[in-house]
Amino acid sequence: MLSGEIFRADWDSRETSWDFARPPYLRGGHSLLQDAFDDWYRRSCETAEEAQRLETENNRYWADVYGLADKVEVDVPLSRVSLTYNPRFAFAPTKGASERAEEEYRWLHFQRSARELISWAIGVTMGRYSVDVPGLVLADQASSLDDFRARVAESRLQPDDDGIIPVTGGAFDDDASRRVKAVLRVVFGVSDLGDNIEFLTRCLAVKSGSTTAEFVPPVIPADPEQALEDYMAKSFAADHQKDYSGRPVYWSLESPKGTFRALIYLHRYTPDTVGQVLTKYAAPFVDRLKAESEAVGRERDAVMGGDR
């Protein structure tokens, strides 16, 4: 593969590329997410090394042409091969910091892949993507489910009916964490769903080492389901905004104190969307919280009354 082709393929592996087809770690038909991420990390490293070889050869050729072979550095460090998915470029230590261990590069690569997988899963839920066809599906203003069905005749996973995904810790059937699990179930299968959720949330828990502390691999969260819900509630919107350079396609609507959240899709937004968020999700959620609070109050009163 030529250097230009390598860099083009690297760019198109990003969801923000117009030519993005599907996540690169979905190749190979793996049923375990860890195997898929391992394979993607290996391919990313091999691609970076090939690009390094080609760039070094190019430098050497031009140095020879201009008689500068003894005067300029022709070897290209792997950390300067500017591929998005080159771990040693993407996660290069800051100036003056010690070199990262191979295991740290690997886990940082896994963490980014986990965040990207969740973003893609939300896209599948919204109809932006499909598990059955590559590339963008619904990406025009006021796109509808009819538009989706025209593009994807037989879909293993239908988009959300209203393009609104509540982020409430499982209070609704179409809650964000449940939707992510539904995509994992379809893509990787039912039998390994538990293992895949454990590994996914383990990747999300990666904490990079510092100049004063060695890297410690993440452990499986005590409650992987809760860890996924926490990520969706606390981190997903910020990660998405960063990945899309401040121009997100999934908008987060939140109550003043952040108790209620919902995601809506830019290209499925209609004049009725905000009203639907309020009537179908926010109001029932508030009623549920109120009922739970009243139930706790009654239990407390019963306990206190029994102690008299």
Predicted regions and their residues:
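Extended amphipathic alpha-helical segments enriched in small hydrophobics
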Residues: 1-62, 290-294, 299-301, 307
